[in-house]
UniProtKB/Swiss-Prot annotation:
This is Ion-translocating oxidoreductase complex subunit A. Part of a membrane-bound complex that couples electron transfer with translocation of ions across the membrane. Pfam families: Rnf-Nqr. It is found in: Cell inner membrane. GO terms for biological process: electron transport chain. The lineage of its organism: Bacteria, Pseudomonadati, Pseudomonadota, Gammaproteobacteria, Alteromonadales. Belongs to the NqrDE/RnfAE family. NCBIfam families: PRK05151.1, rnfA. The complex is composed of six subunits: RnfA, RnfB, RnfC, RnfD, RnfE and RnfG. Keywords: Cell inner membrane, Cell membrane, Electron transport, Membrane, Translocase, Transmembrane, Transmembrane helix, Transport. One of its GO terms (cellular component) is plasma membrane. HAMAP family: RsxA_RnfA. Its EC number is 7.-.-.-.
């Protein structure tokens, strides 16, 4: 039980996918303009990452390995992720049409989010079992969500702040992301992973 908690803390804080491993930067910069959109994207990505981790583990261990076709791993994981994203898109469209409109093109772009494929491949590389794969996927999603929501809140405050003209827009966003990354470096050594 303790190792599962350490795995979760490690993926959320110590080895954060956005700020430490630099995966998922496209939605991090693209959706973080408004807090409401960032929260919606976080929920959708959490669902997709967790379900994709679970599904990719099952595909790897019950289809690819028994048939000896491990060389199709990346292609099959992309297919699994596309199916999970389509399922998520249908669920969001039915349950929250407003959120569906707010997310717009970013919802289908979860398919191309490198963090989702990265989690699936890293699960295999780390040789996680089924439960560890789900926890790793969920932890990566929580870490992504935490960073995305914090960054969106900071960007909303920066939009109304008195920022010097040369630093407005993308410049101050990159500086803020760098400072967030430095803050997360403070968690290094918290968990040996």
């Amino acid at each position: 039980m303790t190792e599962f908690l350490l795995l979760l803390i490690g993926t959320v804080l110590v080895n954060n996918f956005v700020l430490v491993q630099f995966l998922g930067l496209c939605p991090f910069m693209g959706v973080s303009g408004k807090l409401e959109t960032a929260i919606g994207m976080s929920m959708a990505t959490t669902f997709v990452l967790t379900l994709a981790s679970l599904s990719s583990y099952l595909v790897e261990h019950y289809i690819l390995l028994p048939l000896g076709i491990e060389y199709l791993r990346t292609l099959s994981f992309i297919l699994v992720i596309a199916v999970v994203v389509q399922f998520t898109e249908m669920v969001v469209h039915k349950t929250s049409p407003t959120l569906y409109r707010l997310l717009g093109i970013f919802l289908p772009l979860i398919t191309t989010n490198c963090a989702v494929l990265g989690v699936a491949l890293l699960n295999i590389n780390h040789d996680h079992n089924f439960i560890e794969s789900v926890i790793y996927g969920f932890g990566a999603a929580v870490g992504f969500s935490l960073v995305l929501i914090l960054f969106a809140a900071m960007r909303e405050r920066l939009a109304v702040a008195d920022v010097p003209a040369p630093f407005k827009g993308a410049s101050i966003s990159m500086i803020t992301a760098g400072l967030m990354s430095l803050a997360f470096l403070g968690f290094t050594g918290l968990v040996k992973f």
